[in-house]
Amino acid sequence: MTKLPAHVAVTGRVKDWLKDPESRLPVSCTVFHVKDSMEGKDGIEDSWIFTSRALRNAAGVAIDLSDLRPSGTSNGKGLVASGPCSFAAVYSGLNELLRRGGAFRNGAITLYLNYDHPDIEQYLDLSLDIIPWAKRAVYVDENLMQSPHIDKIVKRVRDGSIWLAKKSYDRQGRRLYSNVCMEILLLSRGTCLLSHGNLGSVTVSEIPQMFEKGMQFLCELHSKTGVGDSGIYLTPEEDRQVGFGVIGLSNLLALEHVKYADFVDALEKVLGYGKETPSEPAYAIACALLEGYSRAAIVARAHNMERAFTIAPTATCSYKYRDRDGYTTAPEISPVNCHPI
């Protein structure tokens, strides 16, 4: 059994799996790119089976519908496509019915469509009455501002009904898909295995080792989860990814009496483009974090991981852990989103 190192905060899924590897899979999220076919591997019906099994294993599911033909399109064989929006309610319904059961099994669904898909306007106008249990997102690229639908896209982003994600590719040119929370990029049928370092529970000098040991734990766990035996997910050999994040940054700053602004100045200085002279405690934290990420990256490369970090941690994970003074750890520092679009 993989031993949990000190100061590593695991997700509930990983914690349950460590107690009982036969109970359910420890991965948090997965993605599925739907091909333009009702039947066959990776087709529409296959995506429903995939979604059902993933939700019943407590995973969030991101579904990319961008390859589906627009509504009203003929396939040349006498069949007319109903379009991606017509299937959206199916995924919402699956989430509503399967999101709970037995042990803690809350699921989540995020639907994706390319901003330049012919049915994008219909997608933007989908009512919550039709898909109450699904979140919507739009894949965008550098040509977004030239879209004839840019005003409506901006409007939907501002009212919170639509999220944006960049089209992404790996070094081999393979398409990567955003997961439910949009913090992890995966190959289709890939999975997201997460754990976090608790910055609030360590001293500054302990940060580098926490990163190194935490990444070692996660990389070793990656090959033991049984995900490859599920029949629906990519195997660990095909899906070379983990997600190591942090919780308790604000706790650490408070414990060390460092203002967030001073920490930012120190981080910029350490990264080589800051102009301000940081305070000594802030500079020490920034240096320790940089060393920690560097040491963790070395571990990840040694395990042939292609991606290894996550920015936004699992929020509910942080509420189960405490800092050095006994206070609940904060998930992250999130300034108010007031950026103009």
Regions found by a protein language model. Give the residues of each.
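Extended catalytic cores of very large enzyme megasubunits
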Residues: 1-341
